[in-house]
């Protein structure tokens, strides 16, 4: 009997500790000293540095965009190219790196379709469980929707763009079920990129830096979902991360990169999500 009581108390304490941690992180996010800079009309650049968020130092960079003033599209880099360079050459005003790709071959390993043409399909293996969301763009307007191999096989979109990625973290304000997603991928802290839609109708392009001990140590998927939800996100999709994570604006100095890529230099990637006037 005593063992049962002890176990119950232990579990309750663990539950409340987890709740307290979440509450502490929520408070840290909303009370952070967010440095805000208007890039151009309808687009804000926000950045915050945390001494401890989800137990480690963090650096978070966000572009908050009014979709009424801008259009979105996926830019294919052929061959691979840095997000900042490809986006600038394409005439974009802002961009974030896109979905997962084959480092050697240079092609996307997630479904990519533009104006009725299938450019790439989703690879088998882990990515079939990770890639369960989709950036859907019609007439420059962006949506985030669930995705699967079944939707991929049935897709007949003639106009617009479909880019699979994932996992899908939030839908209609609710945290998505991640039980079918690769646990190591979900639970390990990495640099992360994401796109989100807010309750107010804004679009967020988000990069959380990582792999910089003592400065920015990265975030896992549940933590990223929680952070975006606290920031007002309704729908949110994880993009390729790690050394690929890059947030760029033509209005920022030097190379225009808002975050600090984790490698020694900005990585060449297969595609990017671009913002155009």
Q: Predicted regions span which residues?
A:
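Short, solvent-exposed aromatic-acidic interface loops
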Residues: 76-81, 149-153, 208-213
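Bacterial Sec-dependent N-terminal signal peptides
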Residues: 1-26
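Structural recognition of the beta-strand scaffold that forms the well-ordered cores
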Residues: 93-97, 135-136, 143, 196, ...
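Active-site-adjacent helix-turn-beta-strand microarchitecture at beta-sheet edges
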Residues: 101-186
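Zymogen propeptides
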Residues: 21-134, 143
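Conserved, well-ordered active-site substructure
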Residues: 106-129, 180-234, 244-277
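Conserved hydrophobic/aromatic beta-strand scaffold that supports enzyme active sites
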Residues: 60-64, 134, 168, 194, ...
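Short acidic-glycine loop/turn motifs at beta-strand connectors
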Residues: 65-68, 136-143, 172, 197-201, ...
